Amino acid sequence: MNDLKLDKVSKVLKEVRKSVPLVHCITNYVTINDCANILLSYGASPAMCEAYDEVFDFVKISSALYINIGTFTREQESSAILAAVSAKTHNIPVVLDPVACAAIPKKIQFIDKLFKVGRVDVIKGNIGEIKFLAGETSNVKGVDSLEDGEGALECSRILSEKYNCVVAATGKKDFIVQGKNSAIIENGTEMLTNITGAGCMLGALCAAACGAFEDKFMAVVGAILSINIASEEAYKEAKAPGSFRVKLIDCIYELSEEKLKKEGKIAWN
């Protein structure tokens, strides 16, 4: 059974490269270029469109919408709400990355509004952010989580049931939950924490996967497994942050279904 699931997860990569999903990103200025480049390497087509007068119509032609609230401006907030309304109207999957929501209360107000007027299919955050959204005390420092993973699965399940969506909590181990289904991924490298934007790039990949693959739970598992295995490959040749960041994008480009099936370390429940 586990081999069959891993086989399905590996097919996410195949579907992304076959369909070349158009991923509409409203994201932060720190990592916008990295998100665009890793989407291209994954096989998707990025569009970093955030103008208020354009987003409603642009979502119509997109395969998925990625909303990252890392450096949110007032215009971005207005554009993201309108884009989410369009996504709800036109049945476009939405991935939300609640960056620094545990540190800035106003971000919670935006998230609440997003669920009320728009749609969210996936919440992808670090463990600290996910625990905070689930109503638990979390240990964070700005945009970074200081959590060790304790309680992450339970909090992800609470949040998934509350919002009826896929929840991914990332850390040393990555926890993905949808209802009663869960997966824990143990691939990856600590070097991901030494570059800015690893989580943002992952969120973009999750959106691409959701835009290409009908099973959103498996799509998110596939996206996370992809960046984790790519990071392991990158670290074999790049031991410092600058070269690792570049090599990570290269390794996403070079990734194969066979590599995912061979190297994947996933515990299913």
Curated annotation (Swiss-Prot):
Cofactor names: Mg(2+)
Gene Ontology MF terms: ATP binding; hydroxyethylthiazole kinase activity; magnesium ion binding
Disulfide bonds: none
GO BP of this protein: thiamine biosynthetic process; thiamine diphosphate biosynthetic process
Protein name: Hydroxyethylthiazole kinase
Similarity remark: Belongs to the Thz kinase family.
Keywords per UniProt: ATP-binding, Kinase, Magnesium, Metal-binding, Nucleotide-binding, Thiamine biosynthesis, Transferase
Record: residues binding ATP: K124, T170
EC number annotated for this UniProt entry: 2.7.1.50
UniProt catalytic activity: 5-(2-hydroxyethyl)-4-methylthiazole + ATP = 4-methyl-5-(2-phosphooxyethyl)-thiazole + ADP + H(+)
UniProt function note: Catalyzes the phosphorylation of the hydroxyl group of 4-methyl-5-beta-hydroxyethylthiazole (THZ).
Binding site for substrate: M48, G197
Top-level taxon: Bacteria
The keyword Nucleotide-binding appears for this protein: yes
Endpoints of the signal sequence: none
Gene designation: thiM
Enzyme class: transferase
Keyword Kinase assigned: yes
Pathways per UniProt: Cofactor biosynthesis; thiamine diphosphate biosynthesis; 4-methyl-5-(2-phosphoethyl)-thiazole from 5-(2-hydroxyethyl)-4-methylthiazole: step 1/1
